[in-house]
Amino acid sequence: MPSSYKLRKKIWKSVYLLITVGILYIGYILIKSGYINEKNDINVTKKSLKDNKNFDLKYNIILKDSIFEGVNKNLNAYKIKTERAIKESNNKYKLDIINAIYNVNQDQTLIINAKEGFLDEESSILDLKNDVKLFFDEIIFNTNDARIDLVNKNITGHSPAKLLYKNSSITSDSFNTKDENNIIIFKGNVSTIIDLSD
């Protein structure tokens, strides 16, 4: 009995040893073949990078809670605050949720709100879209788009506009300002309601 026990023990040890060696060998082959594939992938990537020297790197720079500041031609300051600005190119930004303060002169301030817009810092043009509101003293001005020349103090709009002053109102199809915002010209289907008590 002791010899059969020793024989079985020897056989089991040999089987365990063969299984362990087999597992290690299979692992070695898998690792080696994976390394070769990675090496081939790296070579293919290097080759394709050498062949394609013009890289098309596209990325967006997104600025959260941004402020853009400047002055107009009379050196009155303006400040544009936005919840998000996406840099389109060198000095051009797509803006979301805009709140701006524009000093027309030392005594008068124009407050500007819009849901979206586009700022070109080179030309100092602010294009506003989607629920544009301008507040000037007691005047409220609503439109769907407006283009503001921040330096020359001109505002134009090609969508319907409505000006409210206390109980009076003016509506039109488009508008523009003249003489540094002191004159507003309403164009197309102009309707005026004037309350003389205002």
Swiss-Prot record:
<dbReference type="InterPro" id="IPR010664">
    <property type="entry name" value="LipoPS_assembly_LptC-rel"/>
</dbReference>
<keyword id="KW-0472">Membrane</keyword>
<dbReference type="Pfam" id="PF06835">
    <property type="entry name" value="LptC"/>
</dbReference>
<keyword id="KW-1133">Transmembrane helix</keyword>
<dbReference type="GO" id="GO:0016020">
    <property type="term" value="C:membrane"/>
</dbReference>
<keyword id="KW-0812">Transmembrane</keyword>
<protein>
    <recommendedName>
        <fullName>Uncharacterized protein RC0660</fullName>
    </recommendedName>
</protein>
<feature type="transmembrane region" description="Helical">
    <location>
        <begin position="11"/>
        <end position="31"/>
    </location>
</feature>
